[in-house]
Amino acid sequence: MMNGFGIKNNGEFYSVSLQFGAHKLCGSGRFSNVYCGQMISPIEKEVAVKNVWSDTETRHLATSEYPEIQILSKLFHPAISNLLYFYSRNANDKVINCLVLDYLPQDLARLRDQGVKFDVLDAKLYTFQLFCAISHLTSKNIVHMDIKPQNVVMDRMAGRLKLADFGNARRLETNEKTGSAYQVTRFYRPPELLFGCEKFTASIDIWSATCVAFELFANRVLFKGKDTKDQIVLITGVFGYPTDDDIKSIGVKRPRVARKDARGIETFTSKMLDSEIYDFMKATLKIDPKKRKSAIDVLKMPLFDILRSSPPKKRSNGVEMPNLASYTEMHHKREPETEVVADIQTTEKAEKESDSTNEELED
């Protein structure tokens, strides 16, 4: 057992006792790692536990004030890897913030690298869910800032997708600058950040999500630049050198790359996709972020009409499509709140498993 916190529907925190079964390491990075396993109490559920090391900017903060926890506490949606509980622990004189999150077994990057191909219906289904997640973020004035295949988790059998990893997310109302044009991974970085703009808007996520959606439809990266300049060259080669109005709208200096005529997205991708997919891409991949279609407007596009058909279309694996009616709702309630959690008498085996889990999480 360990002491942690849950989240009420109004975003407030409450104390709760947490117990986990065995976990295994599922992913690691410079500042965090993720374990996957079973939560035993207060609910039985497969979860992901993200361990984040505090840095110089966050080490003085209480766990509940940690930026990612603050942002996730404002969100709850079926297409988001929701924060269920959180706690902290000390290891090697460092505070580690631990986020207990919704879990899905795969991510798009691994599936792509394994050569998995999605049929058009499933690609539309996953794209729809991704833009539902962005629409929910926009309604809460939040920008993810790092949408990429590694942060898109999935259950292929069930046809479900969740947007994960909000470590770079920001609130729009703070008028905060990005601080660096490197906030978004290069292949998915929109032109305004490549050009050096430090202001961020919800349109950043629109560009990134469209690049991810292309991978669902085409099974390859859309803009695979070798470096920042090459990324700019690729994008301007498709859409043309930014106009005077584009530069003024973005508020940056002119990029120092050769001026070429626009090839167009169809030619660049060898006209491999259906026209309605290109209509979607041309509406969301605009040099000027103010001209990109919003997530809520994207969801109304003809691209997704097949998902609204009645009766629902059958997926190729025979499994019914998820009920998408709730995905477009802006407000979702968390699980029934339990503020007082009874102590659970554990067996010797469970105690040993818990001790083993704690040792693993401290590695």
From Swiss-Prot:
SMART domains: S_TKc
Biased composition (Basic and acidic residues): 346-355
Subcellular localization, as worded in the UniProt entry: Cytoplasm; Cell projection, Pseudopodium
Cellular component aspect of the GO annotation: axon; cytoplasm; cytosol; nucleus
Residues annotated to bind ATP: 26-34, 50
Entry EC number(s): 2.7.11.1
SUPFAM superfamilies according to UniProt: Protein kinase-like (PK-like)
GO terms, biological process: cell differentiation; negative regulation of canonical Wnt signaling pathway; positive regulation of proteasomal ubiquitin-dependent protein catabolic process; regulation of microtubule cytoskeleton organization; signal transduction
Catalysed reactions listed for this entry: L-seryl-[protein] + ATP = O-phospho-L-seryl-[protein] + ADP + H(+); L-threonyl-[protein] + ATP = O-phospho-L-threonyl-[protein] + ADP + H(+)
GO molecular function ontology, one term from the record: protein serine/threonine kinase activity
Role description: May be an autophosphorylating tyrosine kinase, a bifunctional (serine/tyrosine-specific) protein kinase, or a serine kinase that is a substrate for an associated tyrosine kinase. Acting in concert with putative serine/threonine-protein kinase gskl-2, required for sister chromatid segregation and spermatid budding during male meiosis. Plays a role in regulating female meiosis II, together with gskl-2. Involved in sperm pseudopod formation and function, together with gskl-2.
Protein's name according to its UniProt entry: Putative serine/threonine-protein kinase gskl-1
Organism: Caenorhabditis elegans
